[in-house]
């Protein structure tokens, strides 16, 4: 039996909606982790990394840096932000087992809100290289 390919735009839309709902109801850990998954998916798609390929977020950042260098882009835009974003995710996961969900969730509000903002800015930035990126389900708030 042949496995069908999932509609990636529906998955992205579902995760995007779940992140927004988590943020609205104060589930900041969940919102942060969902945004992390969305940014990972965005990088994988943008860099044409096959879905089944096992690659770390850190390696995705390195591949993104290489892409910018290939494009002769002089400024490593979003490299530091993505690195700090991933490091914060790792700290957040460690905090869950060290200090528990309630404490970690309270401490994650600002980070979750910034993650959502960075996600939108990153989509807008990548769209300058690939205008089709939003057709894949990734969207940002353009104020409309």
Regions found by a protein language model. Give the residues of each.
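A short, mixed-charge helix-start or loop-turn motif at secondary-structure junctions
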Residues: 1-2, 71
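Amphipathic alpha-helical interface elements
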Residues: 2-62, 132-136
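Residues at structural and domain junctions
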Residues: 5, 17, 21-25, 68, ...
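Amphipathic alpha-helical interaction surfaces
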Residues: 41-48, 67-70, 88-91, 95-98
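Short, charged amphipathic alpha-helical segments flanked by flexible coils
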Residues: 47-78, 83
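Charge-enriched, short contiguous segments at helix-coil
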Residues: 75-144
């Amino acid at each position: 039996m042949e496995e069908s390919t999932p509609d990636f735009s529906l998955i992205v839309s579902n995760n995007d909606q779940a992140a927004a709902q988590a943020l609205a109801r104060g589930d900041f850990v969940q919102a942060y982790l969902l945004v992390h998954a969305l940014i990972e998916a965005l990088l994988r798609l943008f860099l044409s990394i096959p879905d089944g390929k096992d690659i770390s977020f850190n390696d995705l950042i390195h591949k993104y840096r290489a892409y910018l260098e290939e494009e002769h882009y002089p400024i490593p835009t979003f490299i530091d932000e993505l690195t700090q974003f991933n490091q914060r995710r790792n700290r957040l996961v460690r905090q869950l087992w060290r200090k528990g969900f309630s404490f970690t969730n309270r401490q994650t509000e600002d980070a979750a809100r910034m993650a959502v903002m960075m996600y939108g800015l990153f989509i807008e930035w990548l769209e300058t290289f690939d205008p089709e990126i939003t057709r894949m389900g990734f969207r940002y708030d353009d104020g409309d």
